[in-house]
Amino acid sequence: MAPGFHFSWLLVSWLVVTTVKGQDVMTPPGSQNNVNPTDCQIITLTPPPTTRNQLTRAQPVTRTPTFYFPPRRPGFYPRFPNIPFFPPNNRRFQLWPFYPPRGRLIPWRFFLGRRQLQSSSSEESLE
């Protein structure tokens, strides 16, 4: 069992049964519990609360404020990069994954190798 609060089902069931039945809790021997619940008279020392006049209502706001919040300054909106964020000096991630940029007009989209960029041997060389 996981460490933590342990309780007894017997204690919980006894507490539920005594609460439902409305019985008195077990009295220690030698003590007397012969008080009738209707013996005492409840006397309130505070006066009853005053009732409000029916004409007293919430007053409507007649003047509307011109603006609620101050105007926003031109802010700095950082873009989320499409690479994962790795904190510096992190030993778990030695190799950083490479994510090529997305888009149509990237320089190496159609020229992927060096062989395509070099001139062919059939061309005449300028001397």
Curated annotation (Swiss-Prot):
Instruction: Give me the Gene Ontology terms describing cellular component.
Output: extracellular region
Q: Where is the signal peptide?
A: 1-23
Tissue localization of expression is: Expressed in enamel organs and not expressed in the heart, kidney, or spleen.
Q: By its UniProt entry, which InterPro entries does this protein fall under?
A: ODAPH (IPR031706)
Gene Ontology BP terms: positive regulation of biomineral tissue development; positive regulation of enamel mineralization
Q: Is Secreted given among the entry's keywords?
A: yes
Keywords from the named record: Secreted, Signal
UniProt key word Signal = yes
Entry's localization field: Secreted
| Primary localization | secreted
PANTHER family (UniProt xref): ODONTOGENESIS ASSOCIATED PHOSPHOPROTEIN
What is its biological role?
A: May promote nucleation of hydroxyapatite.
What protein does this entry describe? Odontogenesis-associated phosphoprotein
The organism's taxonomic lineage, starting at the top: Eukaryota, Metazoa, Chordata, Craniata, Vertebrata
